[in-house]
């Protein structure tokens, strides 16, 4: 059973239904047109094709936020705590993803991935990571020496590295839209431009939940509700009476771009050995499906939940983040780290210096500023970044009819089909579908 402890180029697919005496009725409504929401909607109709299911999304199209603003990496499951949902679902999701891509002819590349130790003190941590990858069931992971590193990536230096041949790249935003397309082909209904405003008791035993949108003046009646709201997940869960803890704190990651004439420097994903003292993986090299090479990212507090630049500011969002006791404790704990991340965002030479540890011939003149993404990271009141996927139902009369995805950061895209299977299994049992 899921529980809280263990656990948003179809534009305007359908306009929202207007209020009427006869409201649209569904067996299940899913909130959120990101990759987890679309994968779950699709899986529900694969396993229960008789269901009447709708998916609602507040933006004009699918995959506008995290699902369309990410590195595009297909992860192998190396980093995650053995026995965690992240570890289990990422390893399972990797195979399910490649199976879907091959069957549906979704373009992808198996670029592989190097996790490189460049200093002697990093080698023991790399050895521990290798052991973790084996425990997690990651396939064909190798520990390689400096000569093999050079063979795989001629411009990269390192003492030792983990080589993950099944790590790849794909356009996860495109994948999300393919999931949505398949969901519609199976009889599902997608409503875009539908910002969720209210979840309420419908006072109807047949369709006990009423889902309302404010600006669109639209409503649904549904038997059950699943929310996969990403950057808004804590706020959406609170609409049904759930605790706001863990809170979503948005972190913006800013990338650099390698100039086209320098793309020959990078062939595969190149990552550092993660430092367990800090909450993020560090800067890395990421090939993209269009041929670009992304370098980075840093990790700084976003001034808006869905703000992708320094000039995108929501005073209310920023105040909410800064006034949260957990955020204050995190800042106190990692103040120096945070200042360095801000510095690297402003002065790209500092970011290039970190990248030169792996590719010494990289120069400041070889890079330009690139895109940014915002990561929905759940944080508890003690200032800890929640390390695993989190699911919740809350309390109250409607709680047996609800499921909320509260925390689904990376590797949620890779894990999406496995997450969808797990949520679907739980929904069938809990909701008696």
Curated annotation (Swiss-Prot):
Signal peptide: none
Enzyme class: oxidoreductase
One GO cellular component term: mitochondrion
InterPro entries from the UniProt entry: FAD-dep_OxRdtase, FAD/NAD-bd_sf
SUPFAM superfamilies according to UniProt: FAD/NAD(P)-binding domain
A GO term for molecular function: 2-hydroxyglutarate dehydrogenase activity
Keywords in alphabetical order: FAD, Flavoprotein, Mitochondrion, Oxidoreductase, Transit peptide
Known cofactor(s): FAD
EC number(s) given by UniProt: 1.1.99.2
Name of the protein this chain belongs to: L-2-hydroxyglutarate dehydrogenase, mitochondrial
Organism: Caenorhabditis elegans
């Amino acid at each position: 059973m899921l529980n809280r402890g263990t656990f948003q180029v179809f534009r305007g697919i359908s306009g929202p239904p207007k209020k009427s005496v006869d409201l649209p009725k569904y067996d299940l409504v899913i909130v959120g047109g990101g990759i987890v929401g679309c994968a779950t909607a699709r899986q529900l109709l694969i396993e229960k094709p008789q269901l009447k299911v709708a998916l609602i999304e507040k933006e004009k199209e699918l995959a506008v936020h995290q699902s369309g603003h990410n590195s595009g990496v297909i992860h192998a499951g190396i980093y995650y705590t053995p026995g965690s949902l992240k570890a289990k679902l990422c390893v399972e999701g990797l195979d399910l993803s490649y199976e879907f891509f091959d069957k549906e002819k979704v373009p992808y590349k198996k670029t592989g991935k190097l996790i490189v130790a460049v200093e002697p003190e990093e080698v023991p941590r790399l050895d521990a990571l290798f052991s973790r990858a084996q425990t997690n069931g990651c396939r064909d992971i190798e520990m390689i020496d400096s000569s093999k590193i050079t063979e795989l990536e001629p411009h990269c230096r390192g003492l030792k590295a983990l080589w993950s041949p099944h790590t790849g790249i794909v356009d996860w935003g495109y994948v999300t839209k393919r999931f949505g397309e398949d969901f519609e082909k199976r009889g599902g209904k997608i409503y875009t431009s539908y910002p969720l405003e209210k979840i309420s008791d419908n006072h109807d035993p047949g369709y006990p939940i009423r889902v309302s949108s404010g600006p669109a003046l639209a409503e649904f009646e549904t038997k059950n509700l699943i929310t996969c709201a990403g950057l808004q997940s804590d706020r959406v869960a609170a609409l049904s009476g759930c605790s706001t803890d863990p809170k979503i704190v948005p972190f913006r990651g800013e990338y650099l771009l390698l100039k086209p004439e320098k793309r020959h420097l990078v062939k595969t994903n190149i990552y550092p050995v993660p430092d367990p003292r800090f909450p993020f993986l560090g800067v890395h090299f990421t090939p993209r499906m269009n041929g670009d090479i992304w370098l980075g990212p840093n990790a700084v507090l976003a001034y808006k939940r869905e703000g992708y630049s320094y000039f995108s500011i929501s005073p209310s969002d920023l105040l909410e983040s800064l006034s949260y006791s957990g955020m204050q404790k995190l800042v106190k704990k990692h103040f120096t780290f945070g200042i360095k991340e801000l510095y690297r965002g402003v002065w790209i030479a500092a970011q290039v210096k970190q990248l030169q540890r792996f590719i010494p011939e990289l120069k400041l003149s070889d890079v330009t500023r690139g895109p940014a993404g915002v990561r929905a990271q759940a944080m508890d009141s003690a200032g800890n970044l929640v390390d695993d996927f989190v699911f919740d139902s809350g309390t109250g009369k409607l709680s047996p009819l609800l499921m909320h995805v509260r925390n689904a950061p990376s590797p949620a895209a890779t894990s999406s089909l496995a997450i969808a299977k797990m949520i679907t299994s739980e929904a069938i049992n809990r909701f008696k579908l």
